[in-house]
Amino acid sequence: MRALERAEVGEVSGRSLLHLQCHVGIDTLSWARLGARVTGVDFAAEGVATARSLAADIDPSAVFVEADVLALPDHLDGHFDIVYTSHGVLGWLPDLRRWAEVVAHFIAPGGFVYVFESHPAAWMLDNRLDTAELRLRYSYFGEPEPLSFEYRSPTAVPDREVPGVEYAWGHSLGEIVSGLASAGLTIEFLHEWPFVAWRMLPCMVEHDDYWWRLPDGLPSIPLSFSLRASKPPA
């Protein structure tokens, strides 16, 4: 868990925390080690199974739920002091308005959601370039139909890969903020950052703080953003 996120979320000890799209639960369990009572959610059965296995050794009280986040109210009860989601998650969701409704549904009165995500402007850049230059390739505003990306996944057999296709939806910063506001939440802050948690572009350089940045000589542009939005007390 990165220091920036810990600082912006604040004290979590003794508080309930719901981690949406938690993958294998590494960050979820990091919050648990800081004292939070955690529940993680992901749609991937293998990811949830791995998270439960890790929790057995780290925090047996951690709960992991296999569910589509957009249908989560059908699979999970209760409310949480903190709803958390981060690092490459929103692009997998076709409906941000529904996502915001789900987020608001699970926040307890006086609680908040914290989002740390790659910046929509960064997703416009051409990630095929090996040179230290910036070139636009994708639209900033999301389209009704998702973008498709071909990839090759490694297997247990040496030198053998399995081809596949993944799909992603673009969402502007305005869509994200307005979705949360329309769901009845109050935006506390929106911060933009010139770094990102992984190597989005081949030319990026990892610094000592483990954030990836553009190399010297290129313009400084937003690569990530963090947002906190709260539900009014009862």
Identify the residue ranges that each predicted region occupies.
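Acceptor-substrate binding/catalytic loop of class I
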Residues: P120-A132, D159-G174
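Short alpha-helix
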Residues: Y167-L190
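A short SAM/SAH-binding and catalytic strip from SAM-dependent methyltransferases
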Residues: D81-R97
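Conserved alpha-helix/loop element of class I SAM-dependent methyltransferases that forms part
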Residues: M1-R15
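A short glycine-rich, Lys/Arg-flanked "PGG" loop and its adjoining helix->strand segment in the class I
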Residues: R97-F112
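Conserved class I S-adenosyl-L-methionine
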Residues: F112-P154
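A short acidic, Gly/Pro-enriched loop at the edge of an enzyme's catalytic core
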Residues: L70, D74-V83
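Class I SAM-dependent methyltransferase SAM/SAH-binding core
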Residues: S16-L72
